Amino acid sequence: MNHESQQQFDPENAPAFERLRDRRRAKRRRVLRVALTLFVCAALLGGAAYYAHRQIIKPYLDTPVSAPEQPPLPEPDPAPEPEPAPEPEPAPEPEPEPGQSALTEAQATDATKTLDLELYSSSAVLVDVQSGTVLAEKGMDEKIYPASMTKVMTLLVAAENLPDLDATFTMTQAIIDPLYLAGASMAGYVNGETVTMRDLLYGAVVPSGAEATEALAQAVAGSEEAFVAMMNEKAAALGLANTHFMNTSGLHDENHYSTVREIALILQAALENETCAEILSAENYRASETEQHPDGLAMTNKFLYRVHHEYSLGGAEITAAKTGYTAEAMNCCASAGKTPDGRSVICVTANAWTGEFCIEDHIALYTKYCGSAEAEG
């Protein structure tokens, strides 16, 4: 075994051995410090490079894109203040167009009597025509179904649009049958009967004939639908906001309605037409002779007949009337009359249980508010 390559521990050389070992340890520490220093420097250099790179990228990530700034626009010159416009002179009241009316609804006053238990009818109005005021009322603006009071408007529109009352119309079964089946009141004209326009007008009002109103509608407008449109146009021309018609006779329809105050205005407009006033005032009428009625069809306004022959109105007088009835409308009537001193009045009632109650309400209103104590006595 070769022992020359290995150093042996010699106690006599111990100090020298310790010094050699210390030098080796010091050398290793220096090497470690240098390596550590190099590592730290490398880390610092890497961090600086990363920071510089982030500062280059960050503005593109964090800064919002915005439009380039525009130079401020110059402020506009203040607009000159407009000169005050001269106040317009009030326009003159327009004249009513043809077909329109200057009539207005009667208005209530402090003197208007409010009726309640003294009437059978649930709605009523008594109007002084000359002053345009309401003398007495009960629910005058409540919705009603006008039933055959509708025929006052039918009469008015037909009379205004018939150039020749002697022109004729031939009655048809197609007109008669549906109305008969609906329970409408009839004048009595029959299929194939040739009737003058005048006789149709009387037949629509005096006996309240629904076949006469349908014939008038066809003669004037070509159909009932077209004629009803004319009726609603007339209502609008009169300023009636609570009236709408669906047919010419007053057969019940939920969309066929009015109020007693507006029916009063329709009657007032009709009475200003000479032909209508004559027909609404007729107690009896006999139509022209025809093949089917050789003596002419006889007609009677039963309401006028009764009030003229069975009642006293305290000096007042009922001069015109049109009644109506359906199960929904019950008994109603629009009448016109005169006070003892000659003033014109209009009375409309609706929703009385019987025809007798309807008549009694008109008698009571004319007697109490239009008659005189001297005449009653």
Place the predicted regions along the sequence by residue.
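Structural motif marking the loop-to-transmembrane transition
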Residues: 24, 28-36, 146, 193, ...
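N-terminal, intrinsically disordered, polar/charged segments of Gram-positive cell-envelope systems
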Residues: 56-117, 126, 131
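Conserved SxxK-family serine transpeptidase/carboxypeptidase catalytic domain
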Residues: 29-34, 49-67, 319, 324, ...
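Active-site-adjacent loops and short helices of periplasmic peptidoglycan-processing enzymes
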Residues: 95-261, 270
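Hydrophobic membrane-insertion alpha-helices, especially the h-region
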Residues: 35-48
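N-terminal Lys/Arg-rich, disordered targeting/topogenic segments
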Residues: 1-32
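Penicillin-recognizing serine hydrolase domain
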Residues: 2, 109-111, 115-119, 123, ...
